[in-house]
């Protein structure tokens, strides 16, 4: 830990020609750790992410730069990306506020105001459109169904291979098989407008002004896409977002498709499996939980609809 902090200090001073006053770990995620770095000149505070996944940090930097020009909420300005031995470092603005995963957010003065603030930011991002679907930097598909079918085939093949090797549970395979069987029905109705999706717009990646009960910004975009609006809604159902009833608020404001509830569970599961592909590891208990939720949602909704 001390050696890594010293490395960060040395790199920041070399790259930005400033003096570092302190380095403190302030967060940890699936792909790396984040350090709060105090320096002697503007911007005075930096967030420096360290990771063994250099390619992922390249993608994150590019996504942050792209997103910052197109949304109303704050996105960290990036300063440099470099690699030292086997560790990559991405330096960016430190957005002041409270992480949405902090327990203190449960005691926020005005939950309704916070909910509306988050929803307004999401709706603003969803007002940014493209005439094609797919990766944010190269959308080439005419429909969302066309893009997601190609994406899902990779998820399916990966899951099947893991299942055949006894590396993934049968309930996960069952859920993925259900998606494959009913794919054309579920995706029969989608939006014809591609909107810009952060890809990981859930509470731990949201920065909150506690006393104003407002969203300040968002960090850590993941697999950013031009997608149908419902793609990102699973993020609203996770963690404290569920307590705020963000998904219910979205459905009050917007007309959703007949199978929206299924797609929320489907996207959540496929997102976790995509992380498994990228990182080579997963939390089996959580994947099982997401699979069971999807199976239940599909049985309920397909029976009613």
Predicted regions and their residues:
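An alpha-helical support segment within catalytic cores of ATP-dependent transferases
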Residues: 3-16, 115, 127-199, 210, ...
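ATP-binding pocket architecture of kinase catalytic cores
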Residues: 23-141, 146-149
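Conserved catalytic motifs of the protein kinase core domain
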Residues: 43, 87, 192-194, 214
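Short beta-strand segments
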Residues: 47-51, 79, 196-199, 218-219, ...
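A glycine-centered beta->alpha junction motif in the catalytic cores
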Residues: 84, 92-107, 156-160, 270-285
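Active-site Asp-x-Gly
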Residues: 194-196, 202-261
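ATP/Mg2+ or Mg2+-diphosphate-binding catalytic cores
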Residues: 252, 275-305
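Alpha-helical scaffolds flanking conserved acidic
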Residues: 260-268
